Design a protein with these regions (language model features):
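Nucleic-acid endonuclease domains
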Residues: 1-98, 107-111, 120-265
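A generic, well-ordered mixed alpha/beta core segment in the N-terminal half of proteins
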Residues: 102-103, 116-119
Length: 265
């Protein structure tokens, strides 16, 4: 694998994601009617036996819980692909309530840092036509912390927002199947820069979240409501997000630290 430039990292991710297979089948429970040892001729046979003997419970159908499971699987897959890059790429995994889910660097990208965040969205199913939108707006960023103050190193981040050469989202779009233990049908992975799928609306009425466009084809084509990244950042950094007491205290602390840090450090 040779040097990967910023646009090519996005294409590299797209290529890898084409080969991702959603193979989560349920939650294993020890209790069941199996007479051990169990013998299976292939994976599908094993799955069927575990299901028939009561060992396979359904994954959660609640969107946030299911998304967490799917995100872990996708990050694991990408980490395996990065590990197979022959040292061209390296990666660090984020934690819970952390941005990004995956930080990519390495000699293949000139030692620069790239933020790769995983988003999961359910298709909005209607009786009249095939799905054309997500059930709700994907959250691109938390608008009142690291995004609004990109030179500060906020808790829950590897480094300041502005230190990244590029921000990329891997978006998993699926149809919920309530009748299977895996819960997921027709998973599609889309890789886009967040600003290219940005809308002018929040993704929550109660939280300070920046929302994406709803249209599935708009997500695929990177057809958001902003013509340029500069327009996206200008609009959302001027947005009147609420800043609660906890966030305000943290902001004041970070600003004080920045003032005390000598230039060049």
């Amino acid at each position: 694998m040779g040097r990967v430039t910023a646009p090519n990292l996005q294409q590299w991710l797209r290529t890898q994601c084409l080969e991702y297979v959603y193979d989560l089948r349920g939650v294993f429970r020890i209790a069941g009617s199996t007479q051990w040892p169990l013998s299976a001729t292939h994976a599908a046979d094993l799955e069927a036996q575990l299901h028939d003997h009561g060992h396979l419970l359904p994954l959660p159908k609640e969107p946030a819980a299911l998304a967490n499971v799917m995100e872990v699987s996708i990050v694991d897959f990408l980490l395996d692909r990065i590990a197979a890059s022959g040292g061209a790429l390296t990666a660090m995994r984020g934690g819970e309530r952390f941005y990004p889910d995956l930080e990519v660097s390495g000699p293949g990208v000139g030692g620069d840092f790239y933020a790769v965040d995983i988003k999961i969205a359910q298709r909005k199913v209607t009786k009249k036509a095939p799905p054309a939108q997500t059930q709700s707006r994907i959250t691109l960023y938390t608008g009142n912390t690291y995004f609004a103050y990109p030179t500060l190193h906020w808790p829950g981040t590897f480094r300041p927002f502005a230190d990244y050469a590029q921000h990329l989202d891997v978006i998993g779009v699926y149809t919920l199947n309530r009748d299977t233990t895996s819960r997921v049908d027709d998973l599609e992975l889309i890789v886009q820069e967040p600003w290219k799928i940005g809308s002018r609306k929040r993704s929550s009425t109660t939280r300070e979240y920046i929302g994406a466009v709803l249209g599935l084809e708009d997500l695929r084509q990177g057809r958001g409501e902003f013509k340029t990244a500069a327009e996206f950042y200008k609009f959302w950094r001027a947005y009147n997000f609420r800043i609660g007491g906890t966030v305000r205290n943290q902001l004041n602390k970070l600003l004080a630290q920045q003032t005390q840090t000598p230039a060049g450090d």
